Design a protein with these regions (language model features):
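Short helix/turn-capping signatures at newly exposed starts of structured segments
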Residues: 1-140
């Protein structure tokens, strides 16, 4: 599946209403529900085998979604970033003049005050060759 970042809406597909039923309809594939835990406000939807995982608030409004490199494409400013090497992403963001912060635990980077996070788990070991495994969009 293909998704695109929107500074205004987080993900262009979710412009407007982001209630659980609409998110499920828009993604349009099989999903399973993981029960609420002590760390989440509500249950979590997992789409496909590894397309996306969505978090909702107590009112079933989307508050965050993570897209995975195995079965998704995620575009930022017109370029696919999932599955790319960190050096590609770093150079691309630099070209755009986008400043990023390295996560405290060294597992990725974030931009736009943490609203968009790139999970790069091997960043410390593999450096510029580490792969972007997922992208998390925060709607809070």
């Amino acid at each position: 599946m293909i998704f695109e970042y929107s500074e205004k809406y987080g993900v262009s597909l979710f412009a407007g209403d982001r209630d659980r039923a609409r998110v499920r309809d828009l993604i349009g594939c099989d999903f399973r529900v993981l029960p609420k835990t002590e760390f989440s406000e509500n249950s979590i939807d997992v789409f496909g085998s590894v397309i996306a995982r969505a978090w909702y608030d107590a009112d079933d409004i989307l508050i965050g979604i993570e897209f995975y490199a195995m079965c998704s494409e995620f575009y930022f400013s017109g370029r696919q970033v999932l599955g790319k090497e960190f050096q590609y992403l770093e150079n691309f963001l630099s070209t755009l003049g986008v400043v990023f912060d390295v996560e405290e635990d060294g597992t990725g980077i974030s931009i736009n005050s943490g609203r968009l996070r790139f999970y790069i788990p091997d960043m410390l070991e593999s450096g510029p060759l580490a792969e972007v495994k997922s992208v998390y969009v925060d709607f809070k």
